[in-house]
Every structure is written in structure tokens, then in C-alpha cells.
Amino acid sequence: MSATIEREFEELDAQCRWQPLYLEIRNESHDYPHRVAKFPENRNRNRYRDVSPYDHSRVKLQSAENDYINASLVDIEEAQRSYILTQGPLPNTCCHFWLMVWQQKTRAVVMLNRTVEKESVKCAQYWPTDDREMVFKETGFSVKLLSEDVKSYYTVHLLQLENINSGETRTISHFHYTTWPDFGVPESPASFLNFLFKVRESGSLNPDHGPAVIHCSAGIGRSGTFSLVDTCLVLMEKGEDVNVKQILLSMRKYRMGLIQTPDQLRFSYMAIIEGAKYTKGDSNIQKRWKELSKEDLSPVCRHSQNRTMTEKYNGKRIGSEDEKLTGLSSKVPDTVEESSESILRKRIREDRKATTAQKVQQMRQRLNETERKRKRWLYWQPILTKMGFVSVILVGALVGWTLLFQLNVLPRLTDT
């Protein structure tokens, strides 16, 4: 099975057909209604205007006045895998995010982006980074940090999610891949697979509990890559026929735009081919992935890491160690990436608009609070003024009565 995919990979590489294959997938993908995402009251719950959940597969918040969240349930029955793919939470949707995690009985959150990338906000800080808990009063949840395990390119947090109303608590694993660039790919299949199997070992992807929540910034590019590779490897482990293109098209029926670039598609093939070695019974492969990923090194500077990974995958710096492991060149054939670049520029504009909108919303909230305080003062001012006037009269009367008492009553008592 992996040999077939490897031959397909080599042919696509030799013929420089990654761009045409990506366009084929995009053109063959079905477009389903996504009306709820466009409702006026839901506009501020979407990070990007062009990334919306389909109506038939969107996750619905239960017991909420508005059940909308930009999240999709991707259900691959033959692999017994279910994922919730969602956008990076906004400041005003963090509370909805944790409500969804609770209601869906999720055991793990897989985060594939950083909160800020290339000076653009990609995701709100929805989990605590120190001992102070985060409280989300709107939906009645609090989150505490229990532990943190920092590796060179990913971090694992253990979080305690508490339902404030019932007092019930759950432990949530938070797997954070910290060096995967937007519209890009991980440094190598080995490092990615080491991370994927770390998530797998936690049992969080198993079907005996709620679906794992997978997110990046938009919830389609990096999230789609992660889900596609995991699904294909599960099917290979089950001995099923694996057609990567058809599986991706099937997954795109649940959430639009999964995998955003030809590079991400190519990397998915590389990771599937490399991951298939584990399904063949190579007991030492995971150990080699861990060694090649160099996860135990100290985390590097984010900016230099981001640049290194981009150069490496564009063929300017080739990882020789990884090539020895996979037998596949990490150099990508030159392709016309105009559509991807235009999407990236559009995404940057959307990020700026979203950041501006958030600042405007915060300013409006401050102005509204100031206006409420002013109205309260205007309401109470005449009452307090009258009360003050009455108090002055009462005090004056009391003082006058006291003086009158001293002048008239006390002399009589003295004479007596």
C-alpha cells in the first residue's frame, strides 16, 4: 500500500504536478450551504470571512442562546476517527470554545499555530500560562494550568477545565506545535510524526470518548494536514486501500478548504509514506523520529525558526538527516504559487481587519461603560443633591434646637 503511494509521490515530483493536483482537488470539492455563519449576529464569531462551517456539519453549542461556533465535525467512519476542526478562538469566542470542549467530551486540544505570527494575531490566548486561572463567566467555566512540558518545537500542557455551576472538573491535554508556519509545513516528516504519535499515545484520538479539537488559525490548512495524515495512517493500519486524493475530498465534505497549498499536500504524502513504516512493524522507527526531531533541545528563537523552516522546504536548505531516513527529497519542485500567495495576502488583510475590529470593540466597550457610569450619575445626582439638602436642613435644625435648649432650658434648670 505505501509502495503505491510512494510511486505516486515520485511521479508527481518528477512531473511537477503538485500544483495541478491541488487545483484538481479544489475544483472537485463540493460546496455546501453555510448560511448560519453569515447571520449578522455571527459575523463577529468568525475570524475570516471566507472560512465558514457548513450548516450540515457545524458543531452546535447546546443550552446557549446562540448555538453558533466556527467549528466543524469531520467524521471518517471507516477509520473510526472524528475530529472537530475549528478556527483559533477570538477574544469573544474563547468562552464558546471551552463550552464546546466540555459538551463534546473532548479529551485533547491540538493547537498547530502560535498566537502571533508575522506580527499578526492568529489566535487569542485561551489557556493560562501561569498559576492564575482563567474564568469565562459567559459560559460558566474556569481553566487552570496543572503542568507544562516544553520541547524544542512543541509543548504539552495539562489543563483543568471546571464547570463552575456543577463543580465538576476534567483534565484536558493541550498539544501545542510551536514551529509550524502559516501556509507552510513542519521542518520534517520525522518531527511531525513524532508529534502526531505523542498525541496518539495519550489516547485522545480514540473513538471511546469525544472528538479531539484540532485548530490552527483558520482551521483548514495545518489542521487539514494533521487530520489527513492521521486518517490515512489509521486506514493503512487497518489494511484498507488508501487513495489520498479521495480521502481528502471526503474530508472536505465536512469542512471547506482543507489543506491550503500544494506544499501542504506534498508534505502530507511524505508524512504518510514515512509513517507507513510504523504500520509495517518497524519497532525502532518512533525512536528514530524522536532522535531526528531533536525535541529535547531548548526551544529556538521563533523568528529564526520560522525562516529556517520556510527556506528548508523551498529547497534552499535541505535536511540531509531527514533524507537519509525517508529516502525522499525535501526539496519542492518549482511551482506557480500565485493562488496561495493571493490567499496569504488576503489572510493578512483579514488578520489586520480582525485586529482592528477587536480594538474597536474594546474601545466601544470602554465607552459604553463610561456612558453607563455617566447615566447612573445623572440618575443619582438629583437624588443625592436633595438628600444632601435635606441633610443640611436636618443638621441645621438639630444645631438650632440644641442652641435653643441651651439658652432656654439649661438656665431654668440652674435656677431651680
From Swiss-Prot:
One Gene Ontology CC term in the entry: plasma membrane
Positions of the UniProt region annotated as May mediate interaction with STX17: 371-410
Pfam family, one: Y_phosphatase
Binding-site list for substrate: D182, C216, S217, A218, G219, I220, G221, R222, Q260
GO MF term list: DNA binding; integrin binding; non-membrane spanning protein tyrosine phosphatase activity; protein kinase binding; protein tyrosine phosphatase activity; receptor tyrosine kinase binding; STAT family protein binding; syntaxin binding
Modified residues (Phosphotyrosine): Y22, Y68
A Gene Ontology biological process term: negative regulation of macrophage colony-stimulating factor signaling pathway
InterPro entries: NR_tyrosine_phosphatase, Prot-tyrosine_phosphatase-like, PTP_cat, Ptpn1/Ptpn2, Tyr_Pase_AS, Tyr_Pase_cat, Tyr_Pase_dom
This enzyme's EC code(s): 3.1.3.48
EC supergroup of this enzyme: hydrolase
Top-level taxonomic group: Eukaryota
Record-listed S-nitrosocysteine modification sites: C216
Keywords, comma-separated and alphabetical: Cell membrane, Cytoplasm, Endoplasmic reticulum, Hydrolase, Membrane, Nucleus, Phosphoprotein, Protein phosphatase, S-nitrosylation
PTM annotation (Phosphoserine): residues: S52, S293, S298, S304, S320, S339
Similarity-based family: Belongs to the protein-tyrosine phosphatase family. Non-receptor class 1 subfamily.
Name of the protein in question: Tyrosine-protein phosphatase non-receptor type 2
Species per Swiss-Prot/TrEMBL record: Rattus norvegicus
